[in-house]
Structures are given as C-alpha cells and as structure tokens.
C-alpha cells in the first residue's frame, strides 16, 4: 500500500 512517508513508517512499525 503506497500512501506516504507516514504510511510507510506505520506499516514498517506494524510489521
């Protein structure tokens, strides 16, 4: 899912 820096960080943090 591509959204933005925040989205990328959130996904990485969740993982």
From Swiss-Prot:
Species of origin reads Gloydius halys (Chinese water mocassin)
Protein's name according to its UniProt entry:
Snake venom serine protease AHP-Ka
Give the Gene Ontology MF terms in alphabetical order: serine-type peptidase activity; toxin activity
This enzyme's EC code(s) = 3.4.21.-
Gene Ontology cellular component? Answer: extracellular region
Question: Where would I find the Peptidase S1 domain in this sequence?
Answer: 1-15
- Tissues in which the UniProt entry reports expression: Expressed by the venom gland.
Species classification: Eukaryota, Metazoa, Chordata, Craniata, Vertebrata
GO terms in the biological process aspect are: proteolysis
Subunit-structure text:
Monomer.
């Amino acid at each position: 899912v591509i959204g933005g820096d925040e989205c990328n960080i959130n996904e990485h943090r969740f993982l």
